[in-house]
Design a protein with these regions (language model features):
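RNA pseudouridine synthases
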Residues: 1-196
Length: 196
């Protein structure tokens, strides 16, 4: 974005000009960035009305019994630890509605590979929602078990698909990002161990 200096007013905040949305630290994958204010405003509007298509791939602890489902719980800052997010009552101060749909891609006994589709985009949404069901993400040192898998580069969460209407042309744009090597290697290892 350096070459766009002077064309971005910092709609999302002075320290993040052009950034339409964020992904969690240690999450890999696709991110929407605008190169000018008009694009930023149009893309931010799509984000606010939840019309941007976002699918994440994740590996969760445990065996999810159903082939698909959803988590619909309000999220906000954890009152005991303000650095974390938590499921809150819908009338709690700062609580925001959040919806995560999920579908099982593969099962490996003690782990399940899932696709998560977001209707909302709250901080740590997938991580907190899945942890609230008893299936935190593999490698998640914040919301997962204390003995999380240290060999992973953070949680197994990847922004795989991203789709939106181009702000100038009106054309639907869809992108797909391959899994990063550490994530793909972990899936390969789980497949081998599960077959053994």
């Amino acid at each position: 974005l350096y070459h766009c200096a002077g064309q971005l007013s910092g709609i999302g905040g002075a320290i993040r000009p052009g950034i339409v949305h964020r992904i969690d630290k240690d999450t890999s994958g696709l991110l929407v960035v605008a190169k000018n204010d008009a694009a930023h405003q149009a893309l931010s509007e799509q984000m606010s009305v939840h019309s941007i298509h976002r699918v994440y791939h994740a590996v969760a602890y445990g065996n999810l019994k159903d082939d698909e489902g959803f988590v619909e719980k309000w999220l906000g800052r954890d009152p005991r630890d303000r650095k974390k997010m938590a499921v809150l009552a819908d009338n709690a101060v700062g609580a925001k509605y959040a919806y995560t749909g999920w579908q099982v891609l593969e099962r490996y006994g003690n782990f399940t590979y899932i696709a998560c589709k977001l209707k909302t985009g709250r901080t740590h949404q997938i991580r907190v929602h899945m942890a609230s069901t008893g299936h935190p993400l593999a490698g998640d040192a914040v919301y997962g078990p204390k003995n999380c898998i240290k060999s992973l580069n953070g949680q197994c969460l990847h922004a795989k698909e991203l789709g939106f209407v181009h702000p100038r042309t009106g054309e639907w744009m869809q992108f797909d990002s391959p899994l990063p090597p550490y994530f793909a290697d972990f899936i390969t290892r789980l497949r081998k161990e599960h077959r053994a």
